[in-house]
Regions:
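N-terminal Sec-pathway targeting helices
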Residues: 1-16
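Solvent-exposed, non-transmembrane regions of membrane-associated and secreted proteins
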Residues: 17-240
Length: 240
């Protein structure tokens, strides 16, 4: 009887180990699939030189590299595409989608595959041309460093000072952003209460939101627009 009991315990341990191993493999595959998909989407973008406006000092314009996004090609994959976001300091470089609610793209990738990585998505209450006073973008805090997981680096004020630039590429304009603050707020904070039917030429504030270590808290970056480049007219509007 003793030997039978020992065998049963051994078999139980093997079964538990097997189940855990399968789950780990599934998680690893999900991370891999998500990373692979978003890496392949970068075939739809290319780096292009952008000239900064001349400074008042008469110095030569600064050389800058921007992105040219194939919105037409990407929308053949997913018609919910509204923008592309880049934060060079932390490697964020993803398409931005907008669903009919704030639930679907939590667990669906750009190609609408079920995946815990989800997508970077615009709040469904915002206008897709980014003309609300406050615009909110959401992304997961992934353990593999993807999506919005590295937003937490901006809790370091020195890092934020040295890497405070972000970019939102829209079909007709590019928004140059300055990251001004990194905060932890309640998921029920008033910042998530968007005003209805209030539009403007460009947002007064763009919020990037991700999960925090506490289930009822969120980590956010506050961003302000410093430049608006209208692509069709090449008009450059700098914000003071």
């Amino acid at each position: 009887m003793r030997h039978i009991g020992e065998k049963m315990i051994l078999l139980l341990c093997i079964a538990v180990f097997g189940i855990a191993a399968v789950k780990l493999i599934d998680i690893g595959k999900e991370y891999y699939d998500g990373q692979k998909e978003y890496k392949e989407l970068k075939a739809y973008i290319k780096e292009v030189p952008v000239c900064q406006p001349e400074k008042m000092t008469g110095d030569e314009p600064e050389k800058e590299t921007g992105k040219e996004i194939d919105f037409e090609g990407l929308r053949k994959i997913n018609e919910d595409l509204v923008a592309w976001i880049q934060i060079p300091g932390i490697g964020v470089d993803y398409p931005v989608v907008q669903g009919e609610d704030n639930e679907y793209y939590l667990y669906h990738t750009f190609q609408k595959e079920n995946n815990k990585a989800g997508s970077i998505f615009l709040d469904y209450r915002n206008h897709d041309d980014f003309t609300d006073r406050r615009v909110i973008l959401y992304g997961h805090n992934m353990k593999d460093g993807s999506m919005f997981s590295n937003l937490k680096q901006y809790q370091d004020s020195v890092f934020r000072k040295n890497s405070d630039s972000a970019y939102l590429y829209l079909p007709e304009k590019t928004l140059h952003l300055e990251i001004t603050a990194c905060e932890k707020v309640s998921m029920r904070d008033d910042i998530y209460a968007l005003e209805d039917d209030v539009s403007c030429d460009w947002p007064e504030e763009i919020i990037l939101s991700t999960c925090s270590s506490s289930s009822d808290m969120r980590l956010i970056l506050r961003c302000k627009i410093t430049r608006v480049l209208h692509l069709k007219s090449d008009e450059d509007t700098s914000q003071m």
